């Protein structure tokens, strides 16, 4: 698994960067149904994407083959509980991976040119991001272009290890001392690894042996099926799209996960934020603590200010009342002390 993680990093990064190069060449259009025939306009991206796809599906002598086939063989030789279902799952994954990888490859780089036309509504999500993306793409009559060297150079640099790194790394990483005890595998308890080590006779022999393996034919079947569906007989997937329209609608809307996230998380966050803003910030903090104390001082000052009328007889009257009150207090306290 660690070996496959390493090889997978190269060709999956290559495919992601290739996708970014295509998006740049298409002026940010990300819908494969608006592409086709890009190989003649983006030759470096086309070739490196082909290399990445071949490595991803486990083509013999490519890096993905050595790590992927090792996992498949290890699962086939395993006798632990559930290994039979695991083997079925990985074999099905071989076909599915080859199918969807070359579906992308054929739709983007081969077939009829579908760019430079007004975009139809393909039923994608209806959030703001998708609405914004609808304004991108090639104008009518405009052609795609290859990406600049700052993009194509990394594509080439990633394509090289996608081809050769598995060939040179399989023996030291799986059967040698590459990890030097950092990863310990008890071969007595893991018979699959022990049998793989005994059957390994070099990377060339391993690749040649796979030429009559069902894994290779499943991968080829996926590639051929993708070619039939999306190059030679596109009416077949169109027929299934009509027959399975409800399923297609769910898939086009990405299982409605974007709508769910928008309605629950995004809208919920906005409602919560508005409540905290109006209730806690404006109501409690600003309204009661900050502005409330200021209003209290203002109210008290306004009340006291009413005493300051500006009329002299009011002040004289207040002084007389004060003097009467002072005399009363003195007499009260003095008489009380005499008693």
Predicted regions and their residues:
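Hydrophobic, small-residue-rich alpha-helical packing segments that form membrane-like cores
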Residues: 1-80
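Helix-coil boundary and interhelical linker segments in multi-pass alpha-helical membrane proteins
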Residues: 1-2, 76-87, 335-339
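Divalent metal-coordination and catalytic microenvironments
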Residues: 8, 35, 64, 105, ...
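Predominantly late transmembrane helices and immediately cytosolic-facing juxtamembrane segments
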Residues: 12, 16, 87-142, 218-241
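Hard-cation-handling environments
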Residues: 115, 124-137, 141-223
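Aromatic-capped, Gly/Pro-kinked transmembrane alpha-helices
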Residues: 171-218, 228-339
């Amino acid at each position: 698994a660690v070996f496959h993680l390493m090889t997978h990093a190269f060709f999956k990064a290559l495919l992601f960067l290739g996708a970014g190069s295509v998006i740049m060449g298409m002026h940010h259009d990300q819908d494969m149904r608006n592409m086709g025939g890009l190989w003649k306009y983006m030759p470096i991206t086309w070739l490196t994407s082909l290399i990445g796809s071949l490595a991803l599906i486990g083509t013999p002598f490519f890096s993905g083959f050595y790590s992927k086939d090792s996992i498949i063989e290890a699962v086939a030789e395993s006798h632990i509980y559930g290994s039979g279902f695991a083997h079925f799952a990985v074999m099905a994954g071989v076909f599915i991976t080859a199918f969807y990888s070359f579906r992308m490859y054929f739709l983007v780089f081969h077939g009829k040119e579908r760019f430079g036309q007004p975009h139809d509504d393909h039923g994608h999500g209806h959030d703001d991001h998708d609405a914004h993306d609808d304004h991108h793409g090639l104008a009518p009559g405009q052609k795609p272009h290859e990406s600049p060297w700052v993009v194509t150079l990394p594509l080439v640099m990633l394509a090289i290890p996608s081809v050769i790194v598995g060939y040179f790394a399989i023996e030291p990483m799986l059967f040698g001392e590459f990890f030097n005890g950092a990863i310990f595998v008890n071969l007595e308890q893991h018979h699959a690894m022990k049998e793989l080590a005994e059957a390994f006779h070099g990377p060339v022999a391993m690749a040649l042996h796979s030429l009559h393996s069902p894994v290779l034919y499943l991968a080829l079947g996926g590639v051929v099926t993708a070619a039939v569906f999306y190059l030679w007989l596109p009416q077949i997937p169109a027929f299934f799209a009509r027959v399975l329209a409800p399923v297609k609608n769910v898939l086009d809307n990405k299982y409605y996960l974007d709508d769910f996230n928008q309605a629950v998380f995004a809208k919920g966050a906005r409602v919560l934020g508005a409540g905290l803003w109006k209730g806690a910030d404006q109501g409690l903090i600003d309204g009661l603590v900050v502005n409330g104390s200021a209003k209290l001082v203002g109210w008290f000052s306004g009340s006291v200010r009413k005493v300051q009328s500006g009329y002299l007889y009011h002040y004289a009257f207040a002084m007389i009342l004060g003097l009467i009150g002072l005399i009363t207090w003195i007499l009260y306290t003095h008489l009380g002390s005499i008693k």
